UniProtKB/Swiss-Prot annotation:
Membrane topology, from the record: Lipid-anchor
Organism encoding this protein: Arabidopsis thaliana (Mouse-ear cress)
Residues anchoring lipid (S-palmitoyl cysteine): C3, C4
Domain notes: The LRR repeats probably act as specificity determinant of pathogen recognition.
Protein name listed in UniProt: Probable disease resistance protein At1g61300
Main location group: membrane
Length: 762
């Protein structure tokens, strides 16, 4: 027995269309197609896009971070990567794009992801975060997903959200952008990719694109002025775009000249700078949190545009300004300073230049000055006219409001006014042509903490009113013609750092022992050499921790004084071989400069030469802290094999030493294969070494090398390089003189030649 049902349906055309649309809607709700995100054409980012895409597609890469300063184009690049997934039909099941932004909460991230997964019904919204994480995990664990998180400011806890951790097994991906490189490490990407500013020609193309041909063609002069405006953006896409759009309708030469003038004198006043550029960059400043680190950052704006700021001196400023805390031990305070410096570089607010310098991007610097002036309301809070061609001190409406003033690197010859700078704490006058500093000018600076007068080579006398600077902690008189220290200097009870290096006319430091707070003293290259009377005076400085000094006579240093020496110059030992064995006992020696002296080899112990000591103790270096070494006119030395026990050498300079035939001698280092030299070397400079034939007998690994500079070393035909020696080949330079010498170099093989031939610069 059976039953048979026959049912016939008949639909008109409109009904069929409604059914089709309904079914399509259900299909869309259960699929996860990638919709392209709108984005502008990229200029100058094509290579970076390709590199980032290829890295993300590697099977072993589950998490990838892109970091870079604000406005550099990370989001634009990220959108381009996202849109590439739209062309991949089968490799990934779902691509989720989330804009995180500062202060985003876990619940908000869960909600955004849930919407992409079609989980957001009323029942789901009433669940707690843990249950929501379970739901998200249940959906994603069976899918090959890509999660793209744009603009994260801190670690995103994937587990708490419910996102399965990407691995080679599940082949899922998590990519993100951030301004802070530290976040990359916290997220698990220890080799993040940095999005950098555009190269000059790419920057010009972007700027032209924003300004438009009509404006650029309106007057031939405008093209040249436009190039100058573009250059002031220093390759930052945000600035190029906003300023380019602002100038798009400016067809008069005078308008462009005015723009250049405003951008040069006070960029924060330029149209749209204060509402479209600087506030965006300020998010990075706000994220620093700690007020001391913020102060450290703002301090960097005192230096000129594009200035390579020496890390150690910057940190010494910070210590004296009180940004680093109350630690009285310089080494610990400096270590803390380096940590703070690292925070600023990881946040892409400063950029490392080698290991000893940082630089601040010009637009970031304008942001710092804008903040320091209370967003333009108190412009005289920071008076910064550094490297702008001044011949006299600038004017200010209210000198009593000035807290920090930087007039460094100008042409100022004298300052004679009687302005009452009663709130001034920082005064940078270095690198001018200063001859006269009025006592009346500094009379009222009772709050002055830092005074830098260095590199004023004609400056020969400090006014007696210096004794009134009762708060002064940092005084730099290096590279001046100062002849004597004023009697009133002894009244500076808080003076902590005193730099008298290369004061070639200074005859005496008598009375310096009364500076009881002095912790750092530099006399290197001064006319005051370390004779017995000077050393006796220095031994009275009970709080002294760092000493830089030149010795020109064999003296018996007590161990305390020897341990205080961080920078040592040795000069003029020509009568007999000079015993340098005492150097090994200097625990804090970081820089050594030997000039016009007679010695053949440095001893690491009183009875052991470098080679003999190293054979016995190959893993115990003597000069652990030595980072800079310079030799000049040392005609008795034939090699420098002893630098094998200086593992942290960063800078090596050898000149005018006619017997030097090799840097490392193979025979002396025969049994020292466990020691690899130059792992931290950044700069190698060799000048006028007529017998030099070899640096090292085989190729070496130079992880940090930036430059090899060879001048007048006619027998040096081969460098210790192979194709893998220098990882930073894009930044690496080889400079040979005479210029033709570069063409005559012998290479390890053809691959080595091809890798480095473009590194040879004229």
């Amino acid at each position: 027995m059976g039953c048979c049902f026959s049912v016939q349906f008949s639909f008109d055309d409109q009904t069929l269309v409604r059914i089709f649309n309904f079914l399509c809607g259900n299909i869309n709700r259960n699929s996860f197609g990638v919709e392209e995100r709108p984005t502008q054409p990229t200029i100058g980012q094509e290579e970076m896009l390709e590199k980032a895409w290829n890295r993300l597609m590697e099977d072993r890469v589950g998490i990838m971070g892109l970091h870079g300063m604000g406005g550099v184009g990370k989001t634009t690049l990220f959108k381009k990567i996202h849109n590439k997934f739209a062309k991949m039909s089968s490799r990934f099941d779902i691509v989720i794009w989330i804009v995180v932004s500062k202060g985003a909460k876990l619940s908000k991230l869960q909600e955004d992801i849930a919407e992409k997964l079609h989980l957001c019904d009323d029942l789901w919204k009433n669940k707690n975060e843990s249950d929501k994480a379970t739901d998200i995990h249940r959906v994603l664990k069976g899918k090959r997903f890509v999660l793209m998180l744009d603009d994260i400011w801190e670690k995103v806890d994937l587990e708490a959200i419910g996102v399965p951790y990407p691995s080679e097994v599940n082949k899922c991906k998590v990519a993100f952008t951030t301004r802070d490189q530290k976040v990359c490490g916290e997220m698990g990407d220890h080799k993040p990719m940095q999005v950098k500013c555009l190269e000059p020609e790419d920057a010009w193309e972007l700027f032209k694109n924003k300004v438009g041909d009509n404006t650029l063609r309106s007057d031939p002069v405008i093209v040249e002025l436009a190039r100058e405006v573009a250059q002031k953006c220093r390759g930052l896409p945000l600035a190029l775009s906003v300023i380019g759009e602002t100038m798009a309708s400016k067809t008069m030469v005078q308008e462009w000249e005015h723009a250049i003038d405003v951008l040069t004198r006070s960029a924060a006043e330029f149209s749209n700078m204060g509402n479209k550029i600087l506030p965006i960059l300020k998010y990075s400043y706000d994220s620093l949190g700690d007020e001391h680190i913020k102060s450290c950052f703002l301090y960097c704006a005192l230096f000129p545009e594009d200035d390579e700021i020496y890390n150690e001196k910057l940190i010494d400023y910070w210590i004296c300004e009180g940004f680093i805390g109350e630690d009285q031990v310089i080494k610990r305070a400096r270590n803390k300073g380096y940590e703070m410096l690292g925070t600023l570089t990881l946040a892409n607010l400063l950029t490392k230049v080698g290991t000893e310098h940082v630089v601040m991007h010009d637009v970031v610097r304008e942001m710092a000055l804008w903040i320091a002036s209370d967003f333009g309301k108190q412009k005289e809070n920071f008076v910064v006219r550094a490297r702008v061609g001044l011949h006299e001190r600038p004017e200010a409406k209210d000198w009593g409001a000035v807290r920090r003033m930087s007039l460094m690197d100008n042409h100022i010859e004298e300052i004679t006014c009687e302005s009452k700078c009663s709130e001034l704490t920082t005064l940078f006058l270095q690198s001018n042509q200063l001859k006269n500093l009025s006592g009346e000018f500094i009379r009222y600076m009772q709050k002055l903490v830092v005074l830098d007068l260095s590199y004023n080579r004609d400056f020969n006398k400090l006014p007696e009113q210096i004794s009134g600077l009762v708060s002064l902690q940092f005084l730099d008189l290096s590279n001046t013609s100062i002849k004597q220290l004023p009697v009133g200097l002894k009244k500076l009870k808080k003076l902590t750092f005193l730099n008298l290096a290369y004061t070639v006319r200074l005859c005496s430091i008598s009375g310096i022992s009364r500076l009881l707070s002095l912790r750092l003293l530099r006399l290197l290259g001064s006319k005051v050499h370390g004779d017995a009377s000077v050393l006796k005076e220095l031994q009275k400085l009970q709080n002294l921790q760092h000493l830089a000094i030149t010795l020109s006579a064999e003296l018996s240093l007590n161990q305390r004084l020897a341990n205080l020496i961080s920078i040592l110059g040795i000069e003029g030992f020509l009568q007999k071989p000079f015993d340098l064995s005492f150097l090994a006992s200097m625990e804090n020696l970081s820089s050594l400069w030997v000039k016009n002296s007679y010695f053949s080899e440095i001893k690491c112990r009183e009875s052991e030469t470098a080679s003999s000591y190293l054979r016995i103790n190959p893993k115990i270096p003597c000069f652990t802290n030595l980072s800079r070494l310079g030799l000049s006119k040392c005609h008795s030395i034939k090699d420098l094999t002893w630098i094998l026990f200086a593992p942290n050498l960063v800078y090596l300079y050898i000149e005018d030493s006619r017997e030097v035939g090799e840097i490392i001698n193979k025979e002396k280092a025969t049994n020292l294969t466990s020691i690899t030299p130059f792992l931290k070397l950044e700069r190698l400079i060799l000048y006028n070494l007529p017998k030099l034939e070899s640096i090292y007998w085989s190729p070496l690994h130079f992880p940090r090398l930036l430059i090899i500079h060879v001048l007048d070393c006619p027998k040096l035909r081969k460098l210790p390089l192979n194709a893998t020696s220098v990882p930073l080949v894009e930044e690496f330079q080889i400079r040979m003189y005479p210029p033709g010498l570069g063409n005559e170099l012998e290479w390890e093989d053809e691959d080595t030649k091809n890798r480095f031939v473009l590194s040879i610069k004229k």
